[in-house]
Amino acid sequence: FTYAVQNGDSLISVGAQFGEDVAALAALNELKPSARLKPGQELHVDNRHIVLHVIDDGIVINVPQRMLFYFHSGKLLAGFPVGLGKRTWQTMLGDFEVSEKEKDKTWIVPESIQEEMVAKGKPLKKRVPPGPNNPLGKHWIRISPSCGIHGTNAPTSIYRFQTHGCIRLKPEDIASLFEKVPVGAAVEIVYEPVLLARLPDGKLYLEVHPDIYRKAGDPLAAVNQMAAAAGVESMIDWQKVNEVIKERRGLAQEVGLPVESILKGNR
């Protein structure tokens, strides 16, 4: 789709808004990642993502994909781009549960972050009251003693790895999720940089992300394994697969062979 640039927009802010990597957004529009945007300028945006459906009820967060999905009764109700932990301060993986929801939460600054403030020469803060300077934003969803899903006062940090492990959403997205998700809901945080999907019409899509935490193996081996499990090896354009792996744009890209090629191969 196309997006009309607003005052104050940058490639970073547009990418954060829609869940598209800055490099991919720049390449799609034949721009440099550092390019300045003009109000009214039209940008092509491609934020197609493969939905990782691993539970029927609750929240699924795929770290390399930087996406959060909320399911209820097997149906996808919402999908949002998120900001996650930097490589040196990683977002935890595993099974969690929503234990608390709170609006306008005072941020009690963890000692580890206080130490980081001092090391970087920043003013030391132990508590940050609700308001525009609170990095938690207006909504807080606790999923562990030390981790939560929350808003932000820095919207351009969304769809990037810049947090101390928590999961950030845009203010309007966390407000929507806050109303939908109940206390007790399941939360699964997974690490899947390679995703393969077959749509009802038979088309095959591959989505490959950088291995930001260096936890994954060979992406081509992962695609081979998924394709074999789905029985679609002969339907895949493996040259295209290699291109998608090399680029790692983090977008769902079609990798299926034309029907004629498949039929010819089956003769």
Each model region followed by its residue ranges:
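Short beta-strand-centered segments at strand-helix junctions
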Residues: 163-178
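Gly/Pro-biased beta-strand-loop elements
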Residues: 49-157, 176-179, 208-267
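Primarily a LysM-type cell-wall glycan-binding module
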Residues: 1-19
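Short, basic/aromatic beta-hairpin or loop at an interaction surface
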Residues: 15-22, 155-165
